[in-house]
């Protein structure tokens, strides 16, 4: 037997109902916030992610699915959404559109070769938003508040918004120099990943998950000590907007994002619930990227966004025992007796469906009792039984499965009956 690839999953019909519910809710919220959907290819040039995500990141060095196509071009299955959206923004000259900033959202499969763990897959579904074309603390606050709104709309509680400022490029450069100076004498005691990051991306050392390295990081200088006046004021304005919006937050000066293109605002949305085992603590993350477009040969434009995993959202809902309203009414199940009635039901079904009536029938030649059980399993609102007598008299009893009451209807008027 051929099995599913490691790190992937089949989403079966009972689960796809939840997915459709979530995706519909997200679409509705994006309309409220005036964000438009964008769809980009599942694979892109490897160079896009090497430049846009960063050569020194774990994503590029360890996690990407990269291959040569038949034209000997290096292609990568997208590991994240921002770089592709920005590439599309540049390529399609969206900076020339009148409705600035451009507010976009996406939803689709991403691919990373990660260690299998709870809530993480090698193919996962990422939803994300990008607001490109406005460097304004109000936009940052809107995006952070939107992230909180999304999770609250599903009934999740125990949410904690963690924020930090990484500063502008000048502040980051000065801070990175201070980190190198701080860690260089003791870097030999750190894990191999941290050792390789010292001179390529020292801020990533702050995000190390190794316990002994975490302890050593506590004595490192903090980015807040190196923010210039511009960065300090921008961060203060973002926090003021969040206060005005009534969005609670916690500051963490060691919060950094795993990708190289972030500047100024960085944030994560977490579950702050003692019942969790820590596997799904972080639900969502993002931040501002003011140099990414130019890094990809685009115009001098700024952006901010975030991304979340649908799989981890579903896991969080399960952990908090939140049931999604995925039950949909099923209008009618047709029970048949005999070949002539069965043939008639096929045509009747077609007429009903073409008029928007959700209907089905039995195709396994079950007895009447078995067909009625199938109607129950489908949660049909109504059933009818068609046999020789019903065909001859052109009369049918429409049974309400909730009340048990029946109403006599002309068989040739059944479609109009359900269209009411």
UniProtKB/Swiss-Prot annotation:
Key words, A-Z: Aminoacyl-tRNA synthetase, ATP-binding, Cytoplasm, Ligase, Nucleotide-binding, Protein biosynthesis
Top enzyme category: ligase
Subunit text: Homodimer.
GO cellular component, one term: cytoplasm
Gene: hisS
GO molecular function: ATP binding; catalytic activity, acting on a protein; histidine-tRNA ligase activity; transferase activity
A GO BP entry: histidyl-tRNA aminoacylation
Name of this chain's protein: Histidine--tRNA ligase
Protein family per UniProt: Belongs to the class-II aminoacyl-tRNA synthetase family.
Alphabetized CDD domains for the sequence: HisRS-like_core, HisRS_anticodon
Key word Cell cycle present: no
Reactions mediated catalytically: tRNA(His) + L-histidine + ATP = L-histidyl-tRNA(His) + AMP + diphosphate + H(+)
Entry keyword annotation includes Amino-acid biosynthesis: no
Cellular location(s): Cytoplasm
Source organism of this protein record: Staphylococcus saprophyticus subsp. saprophyticus (strain ATCC 15305 / DSM 20229 / NCIMB 8711 / NCTC 7292 / S-41)
Enzyme Commission number(s): 6.1.1.21
Database matches in Pfam families: HGTP_anticodon, tRNA-synt_His
């Amino acid at each position: 037997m051929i099995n599913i690839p490691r790190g992937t999953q089949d989403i079966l019909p009972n689960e796809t109902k939840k997915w459709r519910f979530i995706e519909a809710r997200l679409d509705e919220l994006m309309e409220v916030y005036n964000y438009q959907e964008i769809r980009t290819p599942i694979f892109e040039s490897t160079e896009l992610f090497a430049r846009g995500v960063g050569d020194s990141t774990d994503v590029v060095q360890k996690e990407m699915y990269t291959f040569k196509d038949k034209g000997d071009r290096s292609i990568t299955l997208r590991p994240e959404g921002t770089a592709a959206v920005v590439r599309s923004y540049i390529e399609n000259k969206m900076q020339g559109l009148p409705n600035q900033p451009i507010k976009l959202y996406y939803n689709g499969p991403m691919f990373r070769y990660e260690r299998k763990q709870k809530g993480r897959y090698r193919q996962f579904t990422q939803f994300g938003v990008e607001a490109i074309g406005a460097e304004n603390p109000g936009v940052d606050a809107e995006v952070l508040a939107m992230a909180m709104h999304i999770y609250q709309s599903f009934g999740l509680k125990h949410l904690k918004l963690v924020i930090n400022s990484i500063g502008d490029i000048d502040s980051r450069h000065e801070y990175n120099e201070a980190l190198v100076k701080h860690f260089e004498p003791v870097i030999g005691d750190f894990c191999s990943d941290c050792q390789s990051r010292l001179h390529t991306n020292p801020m990533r050392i702050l995000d190390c998950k190794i316990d002994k390295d975490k302890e050593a990081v506590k004595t490192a200088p903090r980015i807040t000590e190196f923010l210039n006046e511009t960065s300090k004021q921008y961060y203060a304005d973002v926090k003021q907007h969040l206060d005005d919006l009534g969005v609670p937050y916690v500051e963490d000066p060691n919060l950094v994002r795993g990708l190289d293109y972030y500047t100024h605002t960085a944030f994560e949305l977490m579950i702050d619930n003692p019942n969790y085992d820590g596997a799904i603590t972080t639900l969502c993350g993002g931040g501002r990227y003011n140099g990414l477009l130019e890094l990809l040969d685009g115009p001098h434009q700024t952006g901010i966004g975030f991304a979340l995993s649908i799989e981890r959202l579903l896991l969080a809902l399960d952990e908090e025992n939140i049931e999604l309203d995925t039950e949909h009414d099923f209008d009618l199940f047709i029970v048949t007796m005999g070949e002539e009635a069965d043939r008639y039901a096929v045509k009747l079904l077609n007429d009903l469906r073409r008029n928007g009536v959700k209907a089905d029938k039995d195709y396994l030649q079950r007895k009447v009792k078995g067909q009625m059980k199938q109607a129950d399993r489908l949660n049909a609102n109504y059933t009818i039984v068609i046999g020789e007598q019903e065909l001859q008299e052109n009369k049918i009893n429409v049974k309400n499965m909730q009340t048990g009451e029946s109403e006599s209807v002309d068989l040739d008027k059944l479609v109009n009956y359900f269209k009411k």
